[in-house]
Amino acid sequence: AMACCAWTMPAVAANAAPAAPAPADGPPLVLPNFAALARRNGPAVVNISVTREVAQVGIELPPGIAPDSPLAPYFARRVIGNREEVSLGSGFIVDADGIILTNRHVVGDAATVDVKLTDKRQFKGRVIGSDPLSDVAVIRIDAHGLPAVATGDPARTEVGDWVMAIGSPYGFANTVTQGIVSAKSRSLPGEAYIPFIQTDVPINPGNSGGPLFDLQGRVIAINSTIYSKTGGYQGLSFAIPIDIALDVKDQLLRNGRVTRGRLGVALQELDATLARSFGLASADGAIVTMVAPNGPGARAGLAPGDVVLSVNGRGVADSADLLDTVARIRPGRQAELAVWRAGRALRVTVEVGALDR
């Protein structure tokens, strides 16, 4: 229901002095200059057009028999063919000699990859490699002296920080959008090993693979996915931290594949209530709920009910943080875990295994 609200100015004595302005709590708010950021970083963002061969099934009829003819079901013949499907995405140059990062789902199963720069030059792209777990792919184009982005440290980004995205939503190249970091270390269904950065930056189909910048113009993440009931932007956007993407890039360029470490345990989040029941002062950490037989954790002596507090001296915030930290350790190397068990602190040394995925 609508309500009409009228505000009446209170009577003031004719000679009354004007009220003094309330003191400011701090310096005036200055909004960031997104125009300068976009101007400086736009040339390193690319538009990616991908062609795929998609199988399709059709029905073929002999000449003279219409599809609605009663004879059609008896003479129809199933035929299988291919059709071309074109999709669009974004990417960004990380090396002046033609190395580009994007999402795997942008270039997966591509027959051809066409890359267009902001100066309207176009190149054929070659997919060097991709990683299903992180959804990161590396493309190379035959060009040199290209504008490349600078990269930052996602760990230094805080909730509430301004961020900016550049990409090609629905093919509209070099579209600039902005917002803030809404949350960090988000774990999405089926993506437990990636601690996503959540933002409210408007992201739509075609933005995938584009960069997320901080206010210093450094890329801190790759825009990857949205949560939506409509298929379009609804305020929930998720990006892959750039340090994870760069590690994937380096491994793909060096080895052609990506390896990750694993503990061989199932984990549960630790909340304030559980932390108190365990006798812990903080809810930081991850609870071990299951240990795979003969896995790295089992061989090291980890047990259900253990709370992992740190890895190699680095504190664990939650289960996604623990999985990410261990994934970055090369298989075969040792890691020292700080573990809380039955009210006392332990040190557990584990030889990190290899993640099969």
Task: Locate the predicted segments by residue.
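C-terminal segment of classical bacterial N-terminal signal peptides
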Residues: 2-12
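Serine-dependent protease modules
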Residues: 14-284, 289-296, 300, 319-323, ...
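Conserved catalytic motifs of ABC-family nucleotide-binding domains
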Residues: 305
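Short strand-turn-strand beta-turns centered on an Asx-Gly dipeptide
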Residues: 311-316
